[in-house]
Amino acid sequence: MLSGHGSRIIGVVLGFSYAHGMQSLQDPFVGELIGTIQMETEENGYYVMLIGGESIQNVVDIASKWNVEGLLILGYNEEQYRSLSRRLNKKMILIDAYPEGAYTFQNVGIDDYSGGYQIGEYLYSCGYKKALFVAETERDSDYYRWMGFKQAMEKQGGFCSRSRYIVIPGKRNLRLRKYRELLPRFLEAKALAFSSDYNAIEAINFFFDEGIMVPEQISVTGYDDSVYASMIRPKLTTVHQDIPQKAHVALERLMKLIQGETLNELNIKNPVYLVKRDSVKE
């Protein structure tokens, strides 16, 4: 075991064990992010230690025992970060964290609001003025994507009520049951904006099994532009975020902190853009 200064170990804290009802590392976004961090870290002569972060004490124990030089943290909220930083004096960069107020910690994320706005604006321009927004939570990135979507839907003077924000269960079997229950409403709305590619692709497969055609009967959009977005048929219209770039920026900033540099900007918000493919009927 390495001790003292200069362990050259970077801890990657994963704050959730499950995503979409499966192990979090099975999620395309998480896998690509952590895979990029691992490759770039080793290119810099460091090593990656993956740490389960649901127990803050577990992070404290492992990071202290192995004397990690810094932490990249995915899936923590402000309260969890505060609790960890009180117990552990390490350099930390959070990824996709959302405080209640202004940022007081180092974070690397994306412009979730803009992505939601771009999707909402596009669907509205295609005539889907009653499109629904579908997500697994009502917080963090899901919430900001909804706010952008809502703003775009209302820019022509209309009203996008909270009832158009559909929250679906985290477990797959319960989600599919919810899709079946909401099918009449989905068909009436004619367009669904999902807060992740994973859920959008899952829904397209569900509709196919039910004999419902995408986009002829229901238009579907995702968010992230994962590797699977262009593999499914129809190819998924989605919001592209540069996941390798997010990983690169987070690691680059952590290395600067480790080397004693001061970072003036607290929140780095990487841009996103709409990718039009075949899952929306224009």
Model features per residue range: what roles?
Residues Y179-E282:
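Flexible loop/turn connectors
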Residues I9-E121, L182-F186:
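Alpha-helical recognition/docking segments in bacterial nutrient-uptake
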Residues L25-E43, G115-Q118, D140-C160, E202, ...:
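Short, solvent-exposed amphipathic alpha-helices that sit
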Residues Y117-G157, L266-V280:
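An alpha-beta-alpha
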Residues M1-R8, K281:
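N-terminal helix-turn-helix DNA-binding module of bacterial transcription factors
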